[in-house]
């Protein structure tokens, strides 16, 4: 049996509702609605009992065990997303590194000769504080992480000076540069 698949997911029935069709699982909550696509002939059942959701499997095939844990994690992330939401913070470290939001675009100045414009997905909200702190929030964990990674890829942190786009509380292991010793 799958350890992750056997975990029960706690919900507040007054806030969260679950609807299942043959191809979609829809979870509604106070922050919005998350849908999970289900493969055809999925041998799993999603049962709501009191204040928990249980994902149960019908057989002991290897593929079913794999899907059991995966879909339990996906449903758990969807429930957390529609109740609390997800958030990632990025920090710009470097001389002249700035960010601002203009309409649907996030403008970044990261030391290149041109500003970088990233289109903000509809399901996300992006806030910029102090021109160097970017907060990305939304109800889909995957989308929040993906957009944060897209921003970070423009200037990954480098180990010598520590400049770049960092996740909040990320520790960059610094390297010592070459030192010029006296010539003999």
UniProtKB/Swiss-Prot annotation:
The keyword Ribonucleoprotein applies. One of its GO terms (cellular component) is cytosolic large ribosomal subunit. One of its GO terms (biological process) is cytoplasmic translation. GO terms for molecular function: rRNA binding; structural constituent of ribosome. InterPro entries: Ribosomal_uL6-like, Ribosomal_uL6-like_a/b-dom_sf, Ribosomal_uL6_a/b-dom, Ribosomal_uL6_bac-type, Ribosomal_uL6_CS. Gene3D superfamilies: Ribosomal protein L6, alpha-beta domain. Keywords: Ribonucleoprotein, Ribosomal protein, RNA-binding, rRNA-binding. Pfam families: Ribosomal_L6. It comes from the Bacteria. NCBIfam families: L6_bact (TIGR03654). Part of the 50S ribosomal subunit. This protein binds to the 23S rRNA, and is important in its secondary structure. It is located near the subunit interface in the base of the L7/L12 stalk, and near the tRNA binding site of the peptidyltransferase center. Belongs to the universal ribosomal protein uL6 family. This is Large ribosomal subunit protein uL6.
């Amino acid at each position: 049996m799958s350890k992750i698949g056997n975990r029960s997911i706690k919900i507040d029935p007054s806030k969260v509702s679950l609807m299942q069709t043959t191809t979609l699982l829809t979870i509604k909550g106070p922050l919005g609605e998350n849908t999970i696509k289900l493969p055809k002939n999925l041998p799993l059942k999603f049962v709501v009992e009191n204040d928990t959701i249980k994902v149960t499997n019908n057989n002991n095939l290897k593929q079913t065990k794999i899907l059991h844990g995966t879909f339990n994690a996906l449903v758990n992330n969807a429930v957390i997303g529609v109740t609390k939401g997800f958030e990632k913070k990025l920090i710009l470290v470097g001389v002249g590194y700035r960010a601002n939001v203009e309409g649907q675009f996030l403008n970044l100045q990261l030391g290149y000769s041109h500003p970088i414009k990233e289109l903000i997905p509809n399901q996300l909200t992006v806030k910029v504080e102090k021109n160097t702190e970017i907060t990305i929030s939304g109800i889909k964990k995957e989308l929040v992480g993906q957009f944060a990674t897209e921003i970070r890829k423009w200037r990954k942190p480098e180990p010598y000076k520590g400049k770049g786009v960092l996740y909040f509380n990320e520790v960059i292991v610094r390297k010592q540069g070459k030192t010029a010793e006296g010539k003999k």
